[in-house]
From Swiss-Prot:
One GO cellular component term noted in the UniProt record for this chain: microtubule cytoskeleton
Annotated organism of origin: Mus musculus (Mouse)
GO biological process, one term: neurotransmitter secretion
Biased composition (Polar residues): 622-635
Low complexity bias: start-end ranges: 177-192, 201-214, 559-580
Alphabetical list of PROSITE patterns matching this protein: DEP, DIX, PDZ
Major location category of this protein: membrane
Protein name per its UniProtKB record: Segment polarity protein dishevelled homolog DVL-1
UniProt function note: Participates in Wnt signaling by binding to the cytoplasmic C-terminus of frizzled family members and transducing the Wnt signal to down-stream effectors. Plays a role both in canonical and non-canonical Wnt signaling. Plays a role in the signal transduction pathways mediated by multiple Wnt genes. Required for LEF1 activation upon WNT1 and WNT3A signaling. DVL1 and PAK1 form a ternary complex with MUSK which is important for MUSK-dependent regulation of AChR clustering during the formation of the neuromuscular junction (NMJ).
Region (Disordered): 89-235, 559-641
Amino acid sequence: MAETKIIYHMDEEETPYLVKLPVAPERVTLADFKNVLSNRPVHAYKFFFKSMDQDFGVVKEEIFDDNAKLPCFNGRVVSWLVLAEGAHSDAGSQGTDSHTDLPPPLERTGGIGDSRPPSFHPNVASSRDGMDNETGTESMVSHRRERARRRNRDEAARTNGHPRGDRRRDLGLPPDSASTVLSSELESSSFIDSDEEDNTSRLSSSTEQSTSSRLVRKHKCRRRKQRLRQTDRASSFSSITDSTMSLNIITVTLNMERHHFLGISIVGQSNDRGDGGIYIGSIMKGGAVAADGRIEPGDMLLQVNDVNFENMSNDDAVRVLREIVSQTGPISLTVAKCWDPTPRSYFTIPRADPVRPIDPAAWLSHTAALTGALPRYGTSPCSSAITRTSSSSLTSSVPGAPQLEEAPLTVKSDMSAIVRVMQLPDSGLEIRDRMWLKITIANAVIGADVVDWLYTHVEGFKERREARKYASSMLKHGFLRHTVNKITFSEQCYYVFGDLCSNLASLNLNSGSSGASDQDTLAPLPHPSVPWPLGQGYPYQYPGPPPCFPPAYQDPGFSCGSGSAGSQQSEGSKSSGSTRSSHRTPGREERRATGAGGSGSESDHTVPSGSGSTGWWERPVSQLSRGSSPRSQASAVAPGLPPLHPLTKAYAVVGGPPGGPPVRELAAVPPELTGSRQSFQKAMGNPCEFFVDIM
């Protein structure tokens, strides 16, 4: 009795299923196939079958009519069951990008993202974005699939009556290469498409005719992960040599005897002025171009064999390329290399080699120690150590600053912390300048690489599609940004990282400091008896005055707080909230100043609004002139303290730092700078309250 073997692939399962129908191959229909799958929700699937087209060769054809005859090859039918949610097909050729992302017909070793026009793959966004939706049907199918997977694992499913383990052992294959055995049973034109990350293998088929024609008809070709280019170049030779690597036009001759298909997709550009040339859209794994490795996505195809594409329309170029591929013999491709204005990719450090970050504080302290440079005025020798130890508190004051070495990254970690780790030089994510339609995108990443990185480096993702959903949420929250601001995530697109500095506006130096050891320390102030330098910094500590010098001039009119202006407790009175100064009335101060022989009038003495210890007693500028008598200075000193020695003009000149320019007296400042002079005098009363040196 005649029977038909049907091999069908389900979702993400690495091993296809085999069923036998007691129907002749030329009479089997889709209804017969669905009857065998009665334990599965067939209404939730689309059915694709391996078929032969007269123009394009081997294709995947969608069949939805139950009475339609199934295409048969060598007495067997090859089918793919794709979930209807998120699955779309292009002209009945392939419905690859389903909810579970299977099966990719040919993986590309490199691509240019969405550089192809929208007509090239119209359903790319909708087909990929359907993965973000969870439906009840999907949950039911996932439950059934998991149950079937456990049953297959327990019963050690057989293929054609042979256990998988025995067949692998007989062929000398590793335990995880089950689909490699099946490739010889299906058809000689099949080859294995492996994904090491997901440990899955799927069967795809292609021939010379279908490779070029399928791309001409603008079928979508999925690139799951960017692969390292193969280094096997024994089957090809080229006229280019090491001395001519600077040329941007190369000719590569490919030996088609070893590789059965060319393995490239082409993109044609057109505008109002005509066709703009043929470009390499993507390179497929296992083809002759991928094995050679010198032709890259984005290169312009100039000539194939002896046919020049320069003055040829896109349709004619496609027709010529189809004819040449269908013939036997070597193929010579002349391409213009994609010009990269910043060729970082040729000189980058391998991703596996970590790049150590530089600590600026440690570098500065080390440089200062070697060169013997003295610290700036107002800093202590241990200021660099203070800066180094306080770097953690400064980092913690930035909102959302990650603690990179405290805990591993999980799905519950802050998304901004994960993005910062992704941007590190040794993170393993390939971030570089990329070309898209001859437009340079600086520091861009591919969506598939982002998903793979999240699935590998972030704990908590059970499946890869969960990592993809997380990447989609990163795009929605602004941590990833598309070149043309697309809001839907696609693994084929290029993305740049969003602006992570938006939270710096809320920077607070006091946040994150739990104790005194975490807080930054101010540098030591100059000696209180030394005149404050007038805005000049010197690379040494200012020395204290010799004993022969008189004490520095201190004006009681600018003391804050207590009535004893010259004492050391004025600041303490202010901080303790003393109200002693509130009892001082303007009349008392005026009588005191007038009786001391000052030159001011009663109208010169004003009291600011609000009383209390925090108020400032203003004093007219005229009392600071050189005409002030020694008697006024002596009488202004608080009781119980010795009178100050008069400050002469000569001391004012020599009072500056040694070796520096002479210090100009405040009275010599032009009148139009009165406001600045008064504020400076206030600051000199208690400089610690005005000048804060933040390390």
